[in-house]
Amino acid sequence: MAENIMVDSHVWVEDPERAWIDGVVLNIKGEEAEIKTNDGRDVIANLSRLYPKDTEAPSEGVEDMTRLSYLHEPAVLDNLATRYELNEIYTYTGNILIAVNPFQGLPHLYDAEVMEKYKEAYFKELNPHVFAIGGIAYREMINEGRNKCILVSGESGSGKTETTKMLMRYLAYFGGHTAVEGRTVENQVLESNPVLEAFGNAKTVKNNNSSRFGKFVEIQFDDVGRISGAAIRTYLLERSRVCQVSDPERNYHCFYLLCAAPPEDVERFKLGDPKSFRYLNQSSCYKLDGVNDAEEYLATRRAMDVVGISEKEQDAIFRVVASILHLGNIEFSKGEDADSSSVKDEQSMFHLQMTSELLMCDPHSLEDALCKRMMVTPEEVIKRSLDPLGAAVSRDGLAKTIYSRLFDWLVNKINISIGQDSHSRRLIGVLDIYGFESFKTNSFEQFCINYTNEKLQQHFNQHVFKMEQGEYQKEEIDWSYVEFVDNKDVVDLIEKKPGGIIALLDEACMLPKSTPETFSEKLYHTFKDHKRFMKPKLTRSDFTLVHYAGDVQYQSDQFLDKNKDYVVAEHQDLLNASKCSFVSGLFPPLPKESSKSKFSSIGARFKLQLQQLMETLNSTEPHYIRCVKPNNLLQPTVFDNANVLHQLRSGGVLEAIRVKCAGYPTNRTFIEFLNRFLILAPEILKGEYEAEVACKWILEKKGLTGYQIGKSKVFLRAGQMAELDAHRTRVLGESARMIQGQVRTRLTRERFVLMRRASVNIQANWRGNIARKISKEMRREEAAIKIQKNLRRQIAKKDYGKTKSSALTLQSGVRTMAARHEFRYKLTTRAATVIQAYWRGYSAISDYKKLKRVSLLCKSNLRGRIARKQLGQSKQADRKEETEKERKVELSNRAEEAVDMSFVLHSEQSDDAESGHGRKAKLSIESEDGLDKSSVLHSEQSDDEELGHERKTKLSIESEDGHSDQSDDEEIEHERKTKHCIQAEDGIEKSYVMHSDQSDDEEIGHKRKTKHSIQAEDGIEKSFVVHSDQSDDEEIGHERKTKHAIQVEDGIQKSFVTCSEKPYNTFSVVSQITSPIRDTEIESLTAEVEMLKALLQVEKQRADISERKCAEARELGERRRKRLEETERRVYQLQDSLNRLLYSMSDQFSQLKSILRSPSMSASTMASAPVVRDDLADSSENSEASSSDSDFTFPAPSPSSDNFSTFNPNQLQVIVQDLSTTEAKGTESYDSDKEGGFEDYF
């Protein structure tokens, strides 16, 4: 291109930072040129390294880079950058789609409307899109019956996973069911993505959602194009990430989702913050920007429901995940024996217990499986202990094994739930596999990943380069050979058998004494002359491979351990014996012949899986999507030219562009071509032509040039197939239009007849419309007259309004002056109202003091009377008690004698005694009932007094707090407070009298300790304080009952006189009596004696009860005494509040005095209202007190009744009488103009 470059030419020149930069040639000297770049720098470069720039290229770039005028690296790079700035992230390169990761959401590119648009369009008819690739693959599968596959490739973080999900979503939309049928296959296929992402994706340095496994989704379709089944294959899960995480990467997403689960799940699994788990806190990254782990956890559970994983299985899955976290927190220390280990501390023991509980296995068996190994020899089985380091390695190995088995179970469960269609003959495969990786530390996982990418690149080379060019040679067509870089040598270096790296690794794993150093030495010796293998300096175990994408240095320290595909026997036996069927299912018993089988390795198994994948890809027709990562910062709108150019070179995109432009991207066999495009030349059907001639006829008829006719195929240039499809669509459209024309003719004739029939009706309607228009004009004219009339009236009304407004303004001024005068008069009225209030307060206080003196005198007299009466009653009770005791002793003695002599009693005396005894019992019962009623009445009265006392005290406090109301309501509040105060003091005095009387009665009752009669008398005395009249009646009744009981006893005693005087003569008298004594009389007397004894016992019991009640009454008196003291304290507070109120009134009298002396007041009124303040109040003990809501501060006087002695009631009455006549008038005028009056006042 150097001959096309001259001075002032626009060229692309290499730049160390931006890869390529445009500029203008200033001067050319020999083979070098001086260029002025667009950033102002002068650069000198060789002409062979300069590329011309297309200055006429579209500003928005081109959709297919095969249409670029200059096809070279800087042009391709500039076109991608231009479209990326416009958010056009998709660009074609022939049939290859290049997708640049936007690192931001672009929902407008993937909604249902866009999918519908691409569903109806042909390939390249619309803008480049991932949906277009899915659409062409689907149409070719349906139309041609060929199986298709779409290979999504690119570096880590280039957007392969998201692109794959969009493809699957579009294919599900294209081949989905029209109606909702529950969990359809397409829904299950789509919802399998979030499940596998949760357990197989993790954050890496280059990507926040990097797939740590390979995935090939095979979507099956039925004969009508609907999805009928699917299968998912996974490759090489990165097991080491479970135990080892580099900063700032993260472990698998599922661990963080489970830590953010709902509280009930976290509590059930005993989880917490991710920082508390060793497998997660190795990195400082716990959160992802824009990702809510709690919401993602619920979304994953919903996706599991759709896929077909039951609730029980979901719980088991997350229980296993939680057990891995607890397993990682188990630490070991040295045991008692040498080279042995044990659980380190209590915390580690807790995590061991939780792990065994979650896995449902024995904790001691788990500890033995981690800390010991069984060695089987021909002679015996030896149990060997592991040191702490060996136990930690065993722990990590168990965690990796459990997670790997869990992931395999998930994939298998998804495949079983979705199901495969064994009768399907059409399928589309979508491959999403890890991209090329090169980190600071590259281990066995990176080796396998890059090996996979080498195989895919080889497949890409074979398809795009070898297969294309080989096809050209086979068909013997003219073409220009394109050189390309082949990576077959590096693939052979890795997989060739024998002698490849994988073969040597398997060989080293089978040797018991192999080490990473011996394995590396073997590699150095075997591949020392290989151009793709290099030995780094200063290392003994590292080696470097020259991949198609760049050089990668691998550390082989863990290659041997990671390549071994086996499970520790102790771990297998432990988990196979788990009580959880899910866990035991992950570790089924091994077949007996497995121990005798050949050695198996991860590398060999992965190589076999990869070969099967290549066979599947080779059996289908591929479509390629190359994903490109624009920058390593993972930020939107940042396009790193050097990074993108490296990906384009390593991905073979530039070479593919050259091949596609120089070659023929589309080819079809003659039969396929004629079956599809024969309708473009129908005359061929009339003759017998060979297939080759017929194909050439069609192409020449449509004016296509540049095509090639091979031996069995037609080779078309880029875009010619789309042109032929457009002609075919046009022919089909013309045929359809002819058919539609005949139908439309018939429909048009029918429509004409209807229109002619309708025209008559239209004309009639039109004439009616004209008449209506004339009528409308007439109505409009009439309306115009009305409008004019209303307008004139409005003008006149406006003039009238102005005149009225002027009059109102004048009247307002006059009324304002009158209102001011009226307001001044209202101030005078208000002052008089305040004076009246204070006068009423003074009168109330005077009345209160008089009532208080009278009440004290009455109380004193009442207490004296009660005390004298109680003294007399006490003496009388003592005398009665002594008499009662003597009579009861004598009665008891006579009753005993009467028992011996009872058979001589006459029937008449027995009847009288029985009647007397009944009356006595009746009187005793009535006396007891009276005593109980008296006690209950006294108790109720005491409770009422207590409630009244509390209510009065509360009213006193409320009256004290209410003193701070506004000045307009002070006179009402003052009257209420005075009334409450008087009521409170009366209640206090009454309560005091009650408590005093009760205390005296309790002391008398305690000294006497009387039985039934004295207890009743004491109850009567207690109730006398509240109900004096009732008490007198009850006392008289009690005395009458007592007298009657004594008479009954005397009657009984008289009946026993004869027997008591001569006891020994009684027997002789009885013997002389000739009349027999009836047995009934003896039984009657005996019963009467027993009844008397029972009565005596009852009386004793009642005496005990009376003594107990006396003690209770004493306690009640003590409690009431305390309440009385509290009441007295509240009374003192109330008196203090009242004194403050009185002093506030005196201060406001002084202020009223100053107001009444103002010039606006009447002279006669002011002269008759002097208010004098007591000077002695200023020297009181209370210095100052202020109301809570008042604007005044005043000193508080001492609580004496002389504070208002200086007020002259006659003078206050003069003021009240003068103003009372005008009070009504002032009130009415105040309501008429309140606002203006206050403005003048202030």
UniProtKB/Swiss-Prot annotation:
Pfam families: IQ, Myosin_head, Myosin_N. Residues 1199-1224 have a biased composition (Polar residues). Residues 6-55 form the Myosin N-terminal SH3-like domain. It is found in: Cytoplasm. Expressed in flowers and leaves. Signal peptide: none annotated. Residues 1179-1191 have a biased composition (Low complexity). Residues 876-1061 are annotated as: 6 X 33 AA repeats of Q-S-D-D-x-E-E-x(2)-H-x-R-K-x-K-x(2)-I-x(2)-E-D-G-x(3)-S-x-V-x-H-S-x. Residues 732-761, 755-784, 780-809, 803-832, 828-857, 851-880 form the IQ domain. Homodimer. This is Myosin-16.
